Amino acid sequence: FSPNSPSDVARCLNGALDVGCGTFACLENSTCDTDGMHDI
């Protein structure tokens, strides 16, 4: 993930919680939000 954009990481983590995705997905810079939405 990009350590130079902590705000983006924070938003990603918040989004991960909303879609029930693991925080590790955000840290690995995956399409957690998209996959989570499709799962739901």
Curated annotation (Swiss-Prot):
Cross-referenced Pfam families, in alphabetical order?
Answer: Stanniocalcin
Q: Which GO terms describe its molecular function?
A: hormone activity
Q: Where does tissue-level expression of this protein occur?
A: Produced and secreted by the corpuscles of Stannius.
Q: Which UniProt keywords apply?
A: Calcium, Calcium transport, Disulfide bond, Glycoprotein, Hormone, Ion transport, Secreted, Transport
Name the source's superkingdom. Answer: Eukaryota
Q: Which cysteines are joined by disulfide bonds?
A: none
Look up the record and report any one GO term of the cellular component aspect.
extracellular space
Q: Where does it live in the cell?
A: Secreted
Q: For this chain's UniProt record, which GO biological process terms are given?
A: calcium ion transport
* Stretch forming the signal peptide: none
InterPro entries assigned = Stanniocalcin
Glycosylated residues, chain numbering:
29
Transmembrane parts of this sequence = none
Quaternary structure and partners: Homodimer; disulfide-linked.
Summary of the function given for this chain in its UniProt record: Its primary function is the prevention of hypercalcemia. Upon release into the circulation, it lowers calcium transport by the gills, thereby reducing its rate of influx from the environment into the extracellular compartment. STC also stimulates phosphate reabsorption by renal proximal tubules. The consequence of this action is increased levels of plasma phosphate, which combines with excess calcium and promotes its disposal into bone and scales.
State the similarity comment. Belongs to the stanniocalcin family.
Protein name per its UniProtKB record:
Stanniocalcin
* Protein's organism: Oncorhynchus nerka
